[in-house]
């Protein structure tokens, strides 16, 4: 099977380079609907066959299931792959009857405990290596810290853990050469601005906040990334489904205003003969801070569909028209300049 040639971009100031399209492995762990293990492993293998070099997983995904599945494949195919996982959640074994499964259909028999302390970060990292069955990963993200996940008051002690010990652990891992890059993986850009006050970071995985539909993170976050030399991986490029014909926006029923904006985006795309999902997938890379777009297919067939959208030629005039109609935030980078 011939691998595609993808553009690669550098992660921050590190020596790491990734293909501009990556593989997010949350869906493979069975969020909302189950994914057979063989299908999940086949999807990871198919991504590598097609030339993708960046794979992202996390302890939370299937409460350990995703890391096991990803490790099953990468133990035989580690060369040339940039792998990221996340820290901040420890998995504790529990009887299935007492388990909080969340949105996972068939998770492994654990509950998650948040811990962003020095010891918690180190334990989480070691646990991930064991689940993966690997002796190294390349990137470690602090996962889901922030008021959006924990509430304003609930986040305060957790942030204190990161501030007083967790960040030190990450720096030790990176500066000691154990890992190559550190960052945060979250759904809210505001906490990333707080993170800049702790020190330097290499890359942030931000889900759903810099998409064709929503550019709320544009300023000050994305502009600060440029100034600080940090890269951005854009997760959730379809805003959980609304940009691929679904009815959900950020995992909830889409409000009428969002539906109306999607219809307006789709009308412009139709004018240029471009499928809306193709424009949504390619849009984030118009920003110079973005190094990778990270969709989460559930099968090799879904990945092939994503690759078809990736191959669509999007004319510069489409972005210019979106900007002229006020469908992109002012200051959004587009090939012709700024919206």
Give the location of each predicted region.
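Non-cysteine beta-strand/loop elements that form the S-adenosyl-L-methionine
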Residues: 82-86, 138-143, 231-238
């Amino acid at each position: 099977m011939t691998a595609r040639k993808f553009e690669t971009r550098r992660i921050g100031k590190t020596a790491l380079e990734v293909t501009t399209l990556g593989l997010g492995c949350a869906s493979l762990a069975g969020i909302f609907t189950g994914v057979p293990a063989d299908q999940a492993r086949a999807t990871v293998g198919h991504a590598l066959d097609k030339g993708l070099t960046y794979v992202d997983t996390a302890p939370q995904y299937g409460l350990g299931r995703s890391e096991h599945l990803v490790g099953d494949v990468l133990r035989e195919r580690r060369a040339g792959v940039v792998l990221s996982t996340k820290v901040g959640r420890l998995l504790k074994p529990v009887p299935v009857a007492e388990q909080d499964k969340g949105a996972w259909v068939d998770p492994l028999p654990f509950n998650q405990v948040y811990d962003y302390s020095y010891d918690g970060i180190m334990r989480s990292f070691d646990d991930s290596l064991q689940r993966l069955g690997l002796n190294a990963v390349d990137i470690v993200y602090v996962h889901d810290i922030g008021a959006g996940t924990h509430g304003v008051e609930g986040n305060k002690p957790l942030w204190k853990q990161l501030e007083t010990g967790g960040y030190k652990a990450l720096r030790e891992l990176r500066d000691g050469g154990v890992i190559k890059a550190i960052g945060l993986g979250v759904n809210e850009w505001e906490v990333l601005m707080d993170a800049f006050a702790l020190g330097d970071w290499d890359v942030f995985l931000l889900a759903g906040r810099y998409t064709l539909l929503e550019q709320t993170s544009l300023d000050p976050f994305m502009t600060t990334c440029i100034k600080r030399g940090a890269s951005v991986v854009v997760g959730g490029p379809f805003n959980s489904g609304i940009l691929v014909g679904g009815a959900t926006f950020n995992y909830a029923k889409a409000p009428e205003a969002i539906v109306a904006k999607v219809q307006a985006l789709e009308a412009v795309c139709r004018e240029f003969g471009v499928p809306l999902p193709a424009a949504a997938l390619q849009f984030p890379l118009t920003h110079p801070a973005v190094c990778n777009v990270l969709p989460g297919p559930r099968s090799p067939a879904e990945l092939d569909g994503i690759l078809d959208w990736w191959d669509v030629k999007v004319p510069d005039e489409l972005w210019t028209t979106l900007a002229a109609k006020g469908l992109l935030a002012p200051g959004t980078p587009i090939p012709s300049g700024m919206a």
